[in-house]
């Protein structure tokens, strides 16, 4: 007797003339297909969309930076002449720089009555401060007006990623134009190292920061102290890492198979129950079942 390979077929075909179509079965089949289509599109969207997950760990991620952090500052002082505006930098490693001018620019505002300071500089990875003041001016003004607007203050590379909502420019748009003109302003910054890793494994390094601020008129035993805008910073030991991830193909295929198989199975059970109940009801109406 020749071997019949067809005996391994677990999907035996039933002739159409031995099956009975029903309206209920048609409705269930249409609903089943629509439900499968909806779930398939939902899973496909999730498969195509890149997910960004974050984690925290203790480390210095950017060890190749030489212990430096790049800073970008853009600030307007509408009531202070440009020749009076200067940037001073100091930290716990002994750095003390007055009137930093490298990679900086002063743009006159209000016909020269005000000034917009834009600068890029680097700071050491130790606690310290940088401040905008009149300390570097050859002739100190009597009452410098330190009201200001901060357009940008960022550390490290600028990350422009849709899925990440971090405090990379937390002070952007800060407005102190209605403050006491003679007051100093202290911004206390906690800088948080941040790593962003894309799907290819390429990493970019940046820094987020939290901020608290206070405004005060400072005095010493010799009288009122010349006001300034202070940015006092410290680094957090915690690093935030964002990683782009996409659902693996095998998991997507497994989910689609589960959706199709599970939906058809449940729909088949539901159709069978409805059909059996309707047949039993017909027999009751015909008096065949008492």
Swiss-Prot record:
Main location: endoplasmic reticulum
InterPro entries found in the cross-reference section: Erv, Erv_C, Erv_N
A GO biological-process term: endoplasmic reticulum to Golgi vesicle-mediated transport
Keywords: Endoplasmic reticulum, ER-Golgi transport, Glycoprotein, Golgi apparatus, Membrane, Transmembrane, Transmembrane helix, Transport
Quaternary data: May form a heteromeric complex composed of ERGIC1, ERGIC2 and ERGIC3. Within the complex, the interaction with ERGIC3 is direct. Interacts with ERGIC3/ERV46.
Function statement: Possible role in transport between endoplasmic reticulum and Golgi.
Name under which the protein is recorded: Endoplasmic reticulum-Golgi intermediate compartment protein 1
Organism of this sequence: Mus musculus
Source organism phylogeny: Eukaryota, Metazoa, Chordata, Craniata, Vertebrata
